[in-house]
């Protein structure tokens, strides 16, 4: 049975990836699962300098999901290379690094720094605020997406993945901009912007007011966006958003995602990624499917 | 891991004690478990180890919302999904004069601590609003003082007043309870230059240190940083914490 898929130059043993920010740098989960079993690991979003993140509370449970306002807490790109990468290198699993710049130059700087052994791919997180343009996310502007992708593409020999935000009017335009900029793949969706209010204090739950919604609550939105994107680009798409089990994963694959990423579910069940891989295998056995690629994009409309 | 409920009973208004079979790792005092409370809850909920002996785990919990309400309705034989024990737990320094301080349902982790603390002399101060619970289980483990806000049982006032009186006679203080109480413990212990460990609470998602959702502010040489309550804590040296 073949479960392996290709994303740019990266060969994945299976299509199950961990979503950025939900798997740390792999350390914690290595106590629960064998990291070697994963298709790939995408690490927590990195910035040029270390970031402390937002004050608590940073989490709020909603109906079938969570709102988060972590604020990109991370040790910075240098500390990642020094302290976290050696650990990840000890496993036989492709490492994809998620980068979040505040300027185009910062994205390029990080892409160059991370063009080293032990890293297979760069995932550009365009959902962060563009400080030069008054804090609006890069990801809502197709010209910005094109520009960052093109410059990062030039700065690295690694597979370049552009991660799109769902908080836009037309995700297809953003996907096309990434493809035109030279992306090897597109991943989506990042969290859906949301809000919660404390009725006793009559204040937003988060100091930042707005948070990012993830988990099963966003799965139908994610699936629809992946479906839309695969119809307009020819590069591979990594689908994510609310995947909780192998059935959810299969929905994304059937719609046309070449691989899937599991995020919030890791918090609920630290074994879920491996369980999803096993579930996909079982489904293939039961349906006598030899190659995962027979499933990908097999939706009949 | 699956765990079978052995008993679940109310011991005060909206406070319950639940025991279940435990075949997992032996806990250290101050560690906690993440329990799937089922129903409409999505994330697991953190609960301290209240007691543990030979494959039998006990938690003490207060009904706060959906999750704890669901828990309170569980019966013998029901199956729970649990991960843990998580977190660092209290650092036990043998042969010291110890003061354990609990406020409300914050006394939960302190019973198991009191049993394992190996003190030269053990004082236990338990503070409640009105209704007291679990006090009898602490009797015999050390010298117990109880306070209630109106003086309905034990001494009248806040448990921290007991701490103020006794701080000169102890080497280390361990505390768990509401934030104002922990803040007072920090002030009293720092002023008296006595070691103090406190157990903090924050909303949690993963419980294992990956999501960075459970941040608490701690002092650093220059400024501050955020640590993870679930992994770096839940127990911190009081002087580190920035409330
Ligand atoms: C390390 C740790 C150990 C804990 N040990 C115990 C224990 O032994 N016994 C016990 O009764 N409770 C304990 N708690 C608190 C307990 O986890 C919460 O009361 C519980 O998650 C509430 O769930 P719920 O679904 O009933 O309420 P929700 O509907 O989720 O919330 C109801 C109320 O509880 C508050 N709350 C929710 N989650 C937390 C949390 N993680 N910490 C503090 N307050 C919260 C909410 O702000 C809200 O006001 C502990 C918390 C932590 C972080
Ligand atoms: C706590 C948390 C932190 C996240 N951090 C990042 C991040 O640093 N970079 C990023 O691109 N996406 C981040 N995400 C988004 C996820 O990678 C994923 O796109 C989103 O949560 C949807 O998938 P899910 O529903 O399976 O979680 C984060 C999500 C959560 C819940
Ligand atoms: S709850 Fe996820 S890091 Fe602490």
Swiss-Prot record, chain A:
Which GO terms of the molecular function aspect are on file?
Answer: dihydroorotate dehydrogenase (NAD+) activity
Any one Gene Ontology cellular component term annotated for this protein: cytoplasm
What Enzyme Commission number(s) does the record list for this chain? 1.3.1.14
- Judging by the UniProt lineage, the source's domain of life is Bacteria
Q: Which PROSITE patterns match?
A: DHODEHASE_1, DHODEHASE_2
> What transmembrane ranges does the database entry give?
none
**This chain belongs to which protein, by name?**
Dihydroorotate dehydrogenase B (NAD(+)), catalytic subunit
The record, for InterPro entries, names: Aldolase_TIM, DHO_dehydrogenase, DHOD_1B, Dihydroorotate_DH_1, Dihydroorotate_DH_1_2, Dihydroorotate_DH_cat, Dihydroorotate_DH_CS, Dihydroorotate_DH_I
- Where does it live in the cell? Cytoplasm
Report the protein's function.
Catalyzes the conversion of dihydroorotate to orotate with NAD(+) as electron acceptor.
Q: How does it assemble?
A: Heterotetramer of 2 PyrK and 2 PyrD type B subunits.
| UniProt: FMN binding residues | 20, 44-45, 98, 125, 163, 189, 215, 241-242, 263-264
Which pathway features in its UniProt record? Pyrimidine metabolism; UMP biosynthesis via de novo pathway; orotate from (S)-dihydroorotate (NAD(+) route): step 1/1
User: Which cofactors is this protein said to need?
Assistant: FMN
| Catalytic reactions of this protein | (S)-dihydroorotate + NAD(+) = orotate + NADH + H(+)
User: Origin organism of this chain?
Assistant: Caldanaerobacter subterraneus subsp. tengcongensis (strain DSM 15242 / JCM 11007 / NBRC 100824 / MB4) (Thermoanaerobacter tengcongensis)
- Gene encoding this polypeptide? pyrD
Q: Pfam family example for this protein? A: DHO_dh
* Gene Ontology biological-process annotations: 'de novo' pyrimidine nucleobase biosynthetic process; 'de novo' UMP biosynthetic process
Locate the active site: 128 (nucleophile)
């Amino acid at each position: 049975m073949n479960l392996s898929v290709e994303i740019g130059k990266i060969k994945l043993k299976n299509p199950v990836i961990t979503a950025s920010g939900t798997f740390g740098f792999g350390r914690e989960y290595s106590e629960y699962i064998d990291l070697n079993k994963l298709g790939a690991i995408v690490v927590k979003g990195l910035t040029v300098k270390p970031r402390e993140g937002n004050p608590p509370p940073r989490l709020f449970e909603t109906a079938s999901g969570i709102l988060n306002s972590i604020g990109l807490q991370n040790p910075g790109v240098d500390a990642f290379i020094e302290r976290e990468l050696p650990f990840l290198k000890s496993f036989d699993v492709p490492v994809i690094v998620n980068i979040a710049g505040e300027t185009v130059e910062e994205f390029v700087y990080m892409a160059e720094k991370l063009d080293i052994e032990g890293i297979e791919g760069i995932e550009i997180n365009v959902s962060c605020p563009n400080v030069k343009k008054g804090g609006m996310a890069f990801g809502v502007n197709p010209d910005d997406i094109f520009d960052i992708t093109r410059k990062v593409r030039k700065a690295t020999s690694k597979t370049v993945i552009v991660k799109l935000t769902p908080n836009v009017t037309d995700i297809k335009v953003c996907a096309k901009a990434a493809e035109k900029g030279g992306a090897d793949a597109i991943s989506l969706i990042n969290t859906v912007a949301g809000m919660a209010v404390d009725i006793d204090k009559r204040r937003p739950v988060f100091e930042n007011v707005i948070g990012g919604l993830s988990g099963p609550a966003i799965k139908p939105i994610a699936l629809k966006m992946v479906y839309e994107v695969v119809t307009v680009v020819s590069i591979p798409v990594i689908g994510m958003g609310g995947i909780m089990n192998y059935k959810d994963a299969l929905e994304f694959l059937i719609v046309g995602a070449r691989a899937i990423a599991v995020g919030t579910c890791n918090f609920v069940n630290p074994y879920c990624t491996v369980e999803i891989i096993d579930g996909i295998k079982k489904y293939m056995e039961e349906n006598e499917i030899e190659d995962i690629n027979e499933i990908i994009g097999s939706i009949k409309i | 891991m699956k765990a079978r409920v052995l008993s679940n009973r109310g011991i005060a208004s909206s406070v319950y004690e639940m025991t279940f079979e435990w075949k997992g790792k032996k806990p250290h005092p101050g560690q906690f478990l993440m329990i799937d409370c089922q129903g409409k809850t999505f994330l697991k909920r953190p609960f301290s180890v209240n007691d543990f002996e030979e494959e039998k785990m006990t938690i003490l919990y207060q009904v706060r919302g959906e999750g704890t309400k669901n828990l309170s309705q569980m019966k013998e034989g029901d199956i729970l999904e649990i991960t843990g024990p998580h977190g660092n737990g209290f650092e036990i320094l043998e042969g010291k004069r110890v003061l354990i301080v609990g406020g409300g349902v914050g006394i939960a982790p302190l019973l198991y601590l009191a049993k394992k603390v190996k003190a030269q002399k053990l004082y236990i101060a338990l503070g409640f609003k009105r209704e007291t619970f679990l006090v009898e289980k602490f009797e015999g483990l050390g010298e117990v003082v109880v306070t209630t806000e109106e003086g309905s049982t034990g001494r009248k006032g806040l448990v921290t007043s007991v701490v103020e009186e006794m701080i000169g006679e102890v080497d280390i203080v361990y505390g768990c309870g509401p934030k104002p109480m922990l803040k007072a413990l920090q002030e009293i212990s720092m002023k008296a230059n006595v070691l103090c460990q406190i157990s903090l609470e924050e909303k949690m998602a993963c419980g294992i240190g990956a999501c960075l959702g459970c941040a608490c502010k701690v002092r650093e040489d220059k400024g501050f940083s955020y640590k993870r309550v679930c992994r770096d804590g839940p127990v911190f040296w009081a002087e580190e914490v920035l409330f």
